Amino acid sequence: MIAPDTSVLVAGFATWHEGHEAAVRALNRGVHLIAHAAVETYSVLTRLPPPHRIAPVAVHAYLADITSSNYLALDACSYRGLTDHLAEHDVTGGATYDALVGFTAKAAGAKLLTRDLRAVETYERLRVEVELVT
């Protein structure tokens, strides 16, 4: 099972993005969406500066077209475990959300697809299986 993070999802939608073609190839391999990454992608694409801002209905359709599977998400007990891991691995600030995405992929047994070199450090600290999409 493979799951993209927000960096792959945004690049997969944005034809003007330098990583668009690689992201589309990755997404066409059959992916599962992580709930947080789906919501974050919606947020990013609907708030880009003009002329790149996307209408909410278009982002919704894009996310729906990627997969018909249920989103991957942590259960309540796993959120408690996540905060334990955050403290144990000294994950702070915005990297906390990278950890949420990575921890969700790991809990689901999915390899995480990313274009975000900065997030790779967090993913690796949590021992998440990662594939860089280039």
UniProtKB/Swiss-Prot annotation:
Q: How does it assemble?
A: Physically interacts with non-cognate antitoxin VapB27 and cognate antitoxin VapB40.
Q: What is its EC number?
A: 3.1.-.-
So what family is this one in?
Answer: Belongs to the PINc/VapC protein family.
What are the names of the required cofactors?
Mg(2+)
InterPro entries assigned to the protein according to its UniProt record, in alphabetical order:
PIN-like_dom_sf, PIN_dom, VapC_family
Enzyme superclass (EC): hydrolase
Which CDD domains does the annotation name? PIN_MtVapC27-VapC40_like
Which species expresses this protein natively?
Mycobacterium tuberculosis (strain ATCC 25618 / H37Rv)
Q: Does the keyword Nucleotide-binding apply?
A: no
PINc domain: which residues? 3-126
Q: Does the keyword Nuclease apply?
A: yes
> GO molecular function, one example?
magnesium ion binding
Q: What does this protein do?
A: Toxic component of a type II toxin-antitoxin (TA) system. An RNase. Its cognate antitoxin is VapB40.
Superkingdom of origin organism: Bacteria
Q: What keywords appear on the UniProt entry?
A: Hydrolase, Magnesium, Metal-binding, Nuclease, Toxin-antitoxin system
Official protein name in the record: Ribonuclease VapC40
Residues that span the membrane, as ranges: none
The leader peptide range reads: none
Q: Which residues bind Mg(2+)?
A: 5, 98
